[in-house]
Amino acid sequence: MFSAAISVFVLATLTAATPMARGIVPAPPAGQCNVGTQQCCNTVQDASSDPAAGILALLGINVQDVTGQVGLTCNPITVIGGVNSNCDASPVCCENNSFGSLISLGCVPVSL
């Protein structure tokens, strides 16, 4: 019994001590997303496309730093039955939605 308790303690300690990069949030796997990060975007493009690259440049974001696709003119998808619960454009899950509805970064498609 004592050795099992020690094993659990050691495993928990090693898990907590695993190094992780600060400030980097990994993108969710394609098709999986938290409800709070789902967006309905009018268009979804590569970061290097002319419209996306232009907006990224205005925001001071290097195109090479963007992983995944970029959503333009996005609105959050709310809970089922809410005002914004359906999406007639491109439903995506994005890493970074901190630029209002203008642009969302690190987007992957999701199924609603």
Curated annotation (Swiss-Prot):
Q: List the disulfide bonds.
A: 33-93, 40-87, 41-74, 94-107
Q: Which residues cross the membrane?
A: none
Tell me if Metal-binding is a UniProt keyword of this record. no
Q: Which residues are glycosylated?
A: 96
Keywords assigned: Cell wall, Disulfide bond, Glycoprotein, Secreted, Signal
Supply the SMART domains for this chain.
Answer: HYDRO
Q: What induces it?
A: A CT-rich motif, which is often found immediately upstream of the transcription start point of highly expressed filamentous fungal genes, is present at the expected position. One additional CT-rich region is also found upstream of the TATA box in the promoter region.
Check the record and name the InterPro entries matching this protein. Answer: Hydrophobin (IPR001338)
One GO molecular-function entry: structural constituent of cell wall
The leader peptide range reads 1-17
Localization recorded for this chain is: Secreted; Secreted, Cell wall
| One GO CC term on file | fungal-type cell wall
Q: Which family does it belong to?
A: Belongs to the fungal hydrophobin family.
What is the annotated role of this protein in its UniProt record? Answer: Aerial growth, conidiation, and dispersal of filamentous fungi in the environment rely upon a capability of their secreting small amphipathic proteins called hydrophobins (HPBs) with low sequence identity. Class I can self-assemble into an outermost layer of rodlet bundles on aerial cell surfaces, conferring cellular hydrophobicity that supports fungal growth, development and dispersal; whereas Class II form highly ordered films at water-air interfaces through intermolecular interactions but contribute nothing to the rodlet structure.
Quaternary data: Self-assembles to form functional amyloid fibrils called rodlets. Self-assembly into fibrillar rodlets occurs spontaneously at hydrophobic:hydrophilic interfaces and the rodlets further associate laterally to form amphipathic monolayers.
- The name on file for this protein is Class I hydrophobin 6
- The source organism is Flammulina velutipes
